[in-house]
Amino acid sequence: MDLLVLVAPLLMAQAPDLQVGRHVETVHQALISQGWQVSDAARRAEPLSARQRAIKAWVPSLITCSGTGAGLCAYGYSRQGDNLRLVSQGDGELVRWQLGDDWYGAGVASR
C-alpha cells in the first residue's frame, strides 16, 4: 500500500501552521489553500456595522467583532469534521485560535 495513502489522513487532521501576529487575510488564504472552508456559522453571520461589512468583504469567514476594547474579531472554518476558530485584534493580527476544544496562541502579539 502506498505510504501517502496511509499518511494523508494524519496530515489532514493536524492543526494548521498558525502564528500569533500574522494578518488574518494572509491566514485566510493559507487555510483555504489547505482545504479549510468558511464555517456554516460564518456563512450565516451578518455584519452589524460598516467596519464588519468591510472586513467580511475580504475575509468571508468573519463571524463577528466586539464593539469595544481591542475590537477583537472571530472567524470560523471547518474541514472534514474539524472546526477552527480564529481571533484577531482590530488591526487584523492573529491573537489566538481554537481547534476543537483546544485554544492556542499567546494573547496579544508582541512586536
Explain the meaning of each model-derived region.
Residues M1-D2, Q19:
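N-terminal hydrophobic targeting signals that begin at the initiator methionine
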Residues A13-A57, T64:
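N-terminal secretory signal peptides
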Residues A42, T64, G81-N83, W103, ...:
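A generic structural signal for solvent-exposed, polar alpha-helical segments
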Residues G90-R111:
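A short, surface-exposed interaction/processing loop segment used at functional sites
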